[in-house]
Amino acid sequence: MYFMIEHVLQTQKEEKFLKPKKMYVSTPYSRVQAVEDRLKVIFEEEFKSEGSILIGYNPSIISKLAKYLSGHISKPASIGIAGETASGKSTITLDIIDTIKSFATEFEIDDAVTRVNTDDYYYDRSDMVKAAGSFSEFAKNYDLDVPQALELELMSSHIKQLLMGKAVYLPKYDMSGTAIRYDNYTLANPSKIIISEGLFTLTEKIKDAFDFKIYVDVRSEVQKERFFVRAAERDLGESANGIYENASKKAEIYVRPCKFEADIVLSGEAVRARYKAFLNKLIGIVQQENFKNRLIV
């Protein structure tokens, strides 16, 4: 398990223990080290800035990220993003994907990013919904807020196949209240980055499928307010209270502990443009290291 630090180590002993190892063999030291030094500055400045997107990060992620961005590691990378409901993880994920796609379009990079949606791996329970008479009646006796409600082993297998360069047919779960899962629904091609987000994306059965683990954190009062705004939009009525209480209770058991598995903890409350701005700084390193003769207009 990774132990998430909140940026500044309190003792020299801790600093020595958590200091990332530098193992650069085939790539010139100067190149990887230069990227790592730039990343340290980028992370440091962002963390210290007002309204930062960063709550904390494991120092070892700097070294690992440097190897990917410098080209020392050229294989595809997988990113897992987790957080409670209404934490902002879906919005952040979409912004990451949009930023990567914009860069890929500018530099004519094919197969830049593939999204694997965690929610699509809920088990098909359509027969149970029909037997109950409605989804709301079904949900009274079936808990969707636990990782056991999803086929995470299948999701892990699909991600690993994509990372090995194999195309995979992904499932599609109907979120409209039928609890139908359509298997082999969407063809996903392998790409340079595989990204997934969901409540249980960093839980035990799936976390090892990801090279980079991100947790999106948010204050409870903000998360609760967002939840009930969304509940009103979905016309959940009085049932929203029970749904929220169950989701919060199960998050305490299954979701919040994932924060301590994460390489990076992001704030789900930062100004949206700042996530893209931070990512563009990382992309700037990729541009300099791999596209030195091509400038973004």
Which sequence ranges carry the predicted segments?
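Conserved nucleotide-sensing/catalytic segment adjacent to the nucleotide-binding pocket
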Residues: T114, Y121-M175
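Glycine-rich phosphate-binding loop used to anchor ATP phosphates in small-molecule kinases
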Residues: E151-D208, V255
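Conserved lysine of the Walker
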Residues: K89
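Hydrophobic anchor at the beta1->P-loop junction of P-loop NTPases
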Residues: I81
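NTP-dependent small-molecule kinase module
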Residues: Y2-K75, D208, F228-A232, K249-V297
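The conserved Walker
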Residues: T85
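Conserved phosphate-donor/acceptor-positioning beta-strand/loop module used by diverse small-molecule
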Residues: D208-F228
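Hydrophobic positions on the alpha1 helix immediately C-terminal to the Walker A/P-loop
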Residues: I92
